[in-house]
């Protein structure tokens, strides 16, 4: 497994996605290594010889300028990685950008397979109108283990329950 830190010019990327104005990808690569992942096409834009799921570039970016540009906009975390994959516990890049965006008036749309997002529940609650989505491809835990390296389905459902009970819109990709 190859994990390294890389410097980037900015973390907020304008997007034409119908669900958001900005895409936020704090990492390149994803160690969930889902066999069905649409984002694996990103490998061709890297210099990594490793297969998708076996490398992770951890982004470092400068402070956000012009915070006013985000008012009444929406940011999607993340279009080609999981913002709460296991190494987020160590590097905390998703938490860093959430802290930088606090008070800007931006809405969040977050997609994950992880319950690590519970760490940031109070922070996410501070962004009105935000929503969080979890991917659940099966209820068969043995099959899930063959398909991805994410946390168990039970842990995903429990995280979803806690966000729902906290008043945050929750959705599920099945």
At which residue positions do the language-model features occur?
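Conserved strand-turn element in the central/C-terminal portion of the radical SAM core barrel
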Residues: 148-149, 161-174
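Conserved Radical SAM active-site core
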Residues: 1-133, 137-143, 153, 157-158, ...
